[in-house]
Amino acid sequence: MCDKCKGKFYITTPIYYPSDKLHIGHTYCTVATDAMARYKRLQGYDVCFLTGTDEHGQKIETRAKETGVTPKAFVDHIVEGEKGVKDLWKLMNISYDRFIRTTDSYHVSAIQKIFKEMYEKGDIYKGTYEGMYCTPCESFWTASQLKDGKCPDCGREVQPAQEEAYFFRLSKYAGAVRDLLVNTDFLEPRSRVNEMVNNFIDPGLEDLCVSRTSFTWGIPVDFDPGHVVYVWVDALFNYLTALGFRNDRYEDYDKYWPADVHFVGKEIVRFHSIVWPAMLMSMGLPLPKKVFGHGWLLLDGGKMSKSKGNVVDPYLLAERYGTDALRFFLLRTFPFGSDGNFSNEALIGCINTDLANDLGNLVSRTVAMTHKYFGGRLPAAQEGREEQDGDLLAMVGSLRGQYEEQMEKYAFQNALAQIFAVVSRANKYIDENEPWRLAKDETQKPRLARVLYNLLETIRVCAGLLRPFMPATTDEIMKRLGGAPSDWESLGLWGRLPAEVAVEQGPALFPRIDVEQELQALEQLHSAPPALEEDPLPEPLPEITFDVFEKVEMTVVKVLACEKVKKSEKLLKFQLDDGTGTPRQILSGIAKYYEPEALVGKTLVAVTNLAPRKMMGQLSCGMLLSAERGDKLKLLMLDDGIQPGSRLV
């Protein structure tokens, strides 16, 4: 840790479930976490900001099968692919220090060790689970916890589940967890405490199912291979494994743990405020200092959900209005601890009012007047007037302290309100002092210079405090102010701009938007089908004669069996019915794109008169036909009514 650092600050988002592209709700939480991390860095803290993806579970296994690819290929595309999770965070200027994927090998081995430790301690035991399961939420429920017979979190149907499973003795820690919630500020907002105690703890905390046998896409329980670790155990310990706990990938556990705050959506507060501390107690580990459960962004009064399809695409909004405008809107408009209704009208109104009219106008007018009246550089001779300047200077002088008070409570909306109260006062200060009138009187030039200096210094402080929310905008404003100081200390002091400050002009920071036209354009964008982004066509091959083509024998085949080839990441081995009565074996390099069991029973096309060849020591008698475009590969599949052995002519 550096000598000048105030201390460490470890902050996390939840790790997101990549069953589909992320939406504006995920972006909201991540932008808030990023703003807090940037604020703490601005203050001089040694910050570790962790985010990532929770990649195991039944829902992803099911989605991958539906898509016809392996679960790993499925999550790789969502996380690493074009406009995936990492691309979105890059677009949104998210300054995370570490990104964890629960499929990372160091995390997998660490979770197996942790699971075994709790088992050997007696806090995990084997039993039989009987109850209800919500696949979209990856949550188990008892009958008494259901709401109108449905999942109390998402309102969707639940399915009965009965299987052999391992359980965590959550009931053992009910008293300790209750005391933690009731008698400390571990969980905020306080309303979440009442919900957890009244709905989950006091009715009787039951032991938690922590393994599954009905699907395979998870971390295997290494001492009982038929079981995979239940997704929430796998997910929660990411906050430790990403620091090097029970692995040698990193060495930051002692440096950063315990976490200063976990930011999570209110739908997963139960896991973070009840299950997570109980498991840490079982392991004898320090608890995080705080869990903050933020509200939802609602659309038409309901929660956004990937599985419901009622989501807002942050990519579209950020590319259309700018990253900083979207970041600002999310944290200026919605109280972080409460639900908020998202609308295009609110977004455009926020950009026009706060960013174009207030902040943008203040910067452009002040810089333009400095150029117009003083050629872009203020003179040293300036005349201050307490009765006219005092109110603005007092507001700026107290701003950092008021802002800090709100930021420490994660009240981002209030912190921004403090800044924009000063911005509004500065715009009023222009009207009160009428620089255009002062410019007409040569004897008033010192007074004019001081008015403009006061405005530029106000802009410096406000822009500096906006950095956690709009980092690129702050950089641009400071550039226009001649590289003005914006470190934390300087933002609490008046007069850090030199008297003879030189400024430079630039385009409007946030041009005004025509509300009616823009709403119509957005409506069309949302209603139009997405444009397909196609890979380029492959280069054509040299011509062949018809006589050559006639020599290729293409036969309809049906998949009898399919399995992965050992020690190969690419090959699948097929046993095929080709109509001859003897199964034909073909090896095909499509393991990245398909689960073997998903292909059994499918009707395909094979070239059956190719000379046999060995691949990975096994004989392949032919080739399956597939279509290739860019990095995508799909098998040619036919209607199941076509009999094996039929020839393509």
Q: Which ranges hold each PLM region?
A:
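Cys/His-rich short segments
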Residues: K121-A174, R178
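Phosphate-backbone binding interfaces of nucleic-acid-interacting proteins
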Residues: P530-V649
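A broadly conserved sequence feature marking short terminus-proximal activation segments
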Residues: F74-Y133
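Helix-rich, typically C-terminal accessory recognition domains appended to large enzymatic cores
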Residues: K126, T333, S338, A346-E383, ...
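N-terminal catalytic cores of NTP/NDP-binding nucleotidyl/phosphoryl-transfer enzymes
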Residues: C2-F74, I100-F115, E120, C137, ...
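Structured secondary-structure scaffolds
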Residues: C2-T51, Y106-A110, C154, P160-K372, ...
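Short secondary-structure capping/junction motifs at helix and strand boundaries
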Residues: M92-F99, Y119-M132, S144-Q145, Q159-A161, ...
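Intrinsic disorder at enzyme termini
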Residues: I477-V548
